[in-house]
Amino acid sequence: MQEKLKILTIGDYESSTLENYFKDSKNIEFLELTLNEGIEKLNSKLFNREIVFLRSKEDNLEKLLEVGRALKEKEIITTTILEEKLVMENKEDLKKSIDAIFPVNKKGDIENLLLELLKMIDNIIFGLGFINLDIEDVKNMLKDSGITVFGSLNINKAISEEVIIKNINYNLNILEYLIKGYSFFLF
């Protein structure tokens, strides 16, 4: 079985650019969980060899934490992107429930940062390039990262794609120090 990156949407979520961007990808799978469903519904679709990206509206934080804890107990690596204010208010609960948390300055930036993060990780694991890591390497990085590996990245319409990519490439250099026992060249 090939490992995949999974995006688990909890509750209602508007139409997403993620689904459009990755609609033909064999490496990324989208899953949904309503607020009244338990994580057991997805037992046959989630494995500890995968990375699960959790996304939910701000008012569904309790369900996000519940799902995060359940997946963490199964040793499934979880990551999410939340508004910075929400992260700071719930720091301890989030650390106990989610492996890697990426705060953003504004709610509207969540989808953009998640898209860039998924593109980068998809390319690192499944793409052809300078960095050739398997999913276990990336899982180890995310498992040990806690709140924000990349720092807050404020994405708005005035920032060009080139600047965003430059920021992400710069932040890849930070990841180099998180990989224990590995040495490789980044850009």
Residue ranges and their predicted role:
Residues 1-187:
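Tubulin/FtsZ superfamily GTPase core signature
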